[in-house]
Amino acid sequence: MSAMSAPSDELVVIGKIVSVHGVRGDVKVYSFTDPIDNLLDYRRWTLRRGDEVKQVELVKGRLQGKILVASLKGLTDREVARTYADFEICVPRSELPALDDGEYYWYQLQGLKVLNQAGQLLGQVDHLLETGANDVLVVKPCAGSLDDRERLLPYTDHCVLKVDLDSGEMQVDWDADF
């Protein structure tokens, strides 16, 4: 394991170390990938917590309920493993699989300005939530927004009409009064 600096804009967060598991230095990981165990396809992780950055290598991992248990190269002590809690697990964007047209990674949607069909700026995508039925866009007010309300919009074909990454905008079918 080594310390390094990596431009954070080239990295995508795919999970987070939440705690230690067992006595041999394994860690419990919350995965942001779908399916959950896709995170285990990436063998080299960049760990990030605040300004602290480390490179680690995944030796093995397994799904245990809704959490992953991972063994990292050189990490064999429970107390040392405990210090890894709250590190985000990142990989370079270039390692993510290509998507079909009209499909987007969540990180690509974050920061997009959201306009309704009347051209009203509702806000900016802050983050997304996974609800089970469909993902939900959390749209927070930004400079030039119609008002200062936070909105929750379903990320569905019916609601999201167009995504334009180049212009940094998303058009939605959404009444400003909702």
From Swiss-Prot:
Segments forming domain PRC barrel: 101-178
Keywords attached to this entry: Chaperone, Cytoplasm, Ribosome biogenesis, rRNA processing
Gene Ontology biological process terms, A to Z: ribosomal small subunit biogenesis; rRNA processing
Highest taxon of the lineage: Bacteria
SUPFAM superfamilies per record: PRC-barrel domain, Translation proteins
Predominant place of localization: cytoplasm
Subcellular location: Cytoplasm
Entry's Gene Ontology cellular component terms: cytoplasm; ribosome
A molecular-function term among this protein's GO annotations: ribosome binding
InterPro entries tied to this protein: PRC_barrel-like_sf (IPR011033), PRC_RimM (IPR056792), RimM (IPR011961), RimM_N (IPR002676), RimM_N_sf (IPR036976), Transl_B-barrel_sf (IPR009000)
Subunit structure: Binds ribosomal protein uS19.
Domains as described in the record: The PRC barrel domain binds ribosomal protein uS19.
Family from the record: Belongs to the RimM family.
Role summary: An accessory protein needed during the final step in the assembly of 30S ribosomal subunit, possibly for assembly of the head region. Essential for efficient processing of 16S rRNA. May be needed both before and after RbfA during the maturation of 16S rRNA. It has affinity for free ribosomal 30S subunits but not for 70S ribosomes.
Record protein name field: Ribosome maturation factor RimM
Lineage of source species: Bacteria, Pseudomonadati, Pseudomonadota, Gammaproteobacteria, Pseudomonadales
